[in-house]
């Protein structure tokens, strides 16, 4: 498994044992990105408690600093302060803005920068990000008058953005994508007239909740499709943001706790935004034993502690209708399916083919190496579970969610495994491997 550009030896993953205890997962990645972005274009100071100190939000912070925004050092457990420059105060940077591995950073930056009239920006990223499609953001922005250029007709980074005075419009997004929607809402803040974004189904709504909290003139409605309207001209005001734990990171513990004999885990302070809880719906459908403890509301976002204990699971079948609320959880659910007696089916998941990796192909390939019975389809997979997985030489193929999913699978295998490029987990959960050891019993 060479050619990774990494010198790290494969991580040894021991089979067997159980997991018990309490765990706090890192701050929600979506909310971390947005609190930095909205704080940067607000007036005054924004404080962020619980910001995820992982590679993707660090990329967003680095881009904002390059445009004159003062952001305090981002450390684990520290409070981050952002000194806002106002809705049109971002400076033209002297260097290329490096988005690292973060598709969220690049897509939201396109919306943020498209309306900076008279300023020029270049966005780039790592080899993986340079392969990810960006036209899905650039094309609707163009209907507002934005100018985005790049390889493959503006689809692939590096991307050049020439800031323009944008015009408000009504835009339908072809897919329910929080990143596309959020980019358009950011662009709408400095347009000449109101903008309405219509999405075919609801995607994650962190941007709407948070922009309203920061003071944007934003309304949500619509009978057919979901309409989000922004009237430009409002001044955003700095806020104190408390970032809940990321349910996409909690998902690894939820599935591990449900699958592993003797497991009893409590995951503290997890964001339970209804646009993100598809994983809980599917685990409920499977018969998993999950309790929501101490439900509460923190800064407009529902939060709770989740307790999961081991029990028998049934196979599942889910598709397009629930996909926006669990798109990042498909890799770990594919692991769960391997241990359910019977056939599980995932469909409507073609979006996973353009994530950090082709996640459908990578999960099928790696689980098959452990002996799983999987058929891959264009938009999903069929998994016939109930046969034991065996330890194997595995590879995250540089994908953080694949790395952690395989870490759970390896605990349940017959025989030990090794995992190449396990350090990919740091993109969203830097302490994952340490926590796995701590909870092990």
Swiss-Prot record:
PROSITE patterns: EPSP_SYNTHASE_1, EPSP_SYNTHASE_2. Phosphoenolpyruvate binds at residues 29, 103, 132, 179, 359, 401. Its EC number is 2.5.1.19. Pathway: Metabolic intermediate biosynthesis; chorismate biosynthesis; chorismate from D-erythrose 4-phosphate and phosphoenolpyruvate: step 6/7. 3-phosphoshikimate binds at residues 29-30, 34, 177, 179, 328, 355. GO terms for biological process: amino acid biosynthetic process; aromatic amino acid family biosynthetic process; chorismate biosynthetic process. It catalyses: 3-phosphoshikimate + phosphoenolpyruvate = 5-O-(1-carboxyvinyl)-3-phosphoshikimate + phosphate. GO terms for molecular function: 3-phosphoshikimate 1-carboxyvinyltransferase activity. Residues 1-24 are annotated as: Disordered. Belongs to the EPSP synthase family. Catalyzes the transfer of the enolpyruvyl moiety of phosphoenolpyruvate (PEP) to the 5-hydroxyl of shikimate-3-phosphate (S3P) to produce enolpyruvyl shikimate-3-phosphate and inorganic phosphate. Monomer. This is 3-phosphoshikimate 1-carboxyvinyltransferase. The gene is aroA.
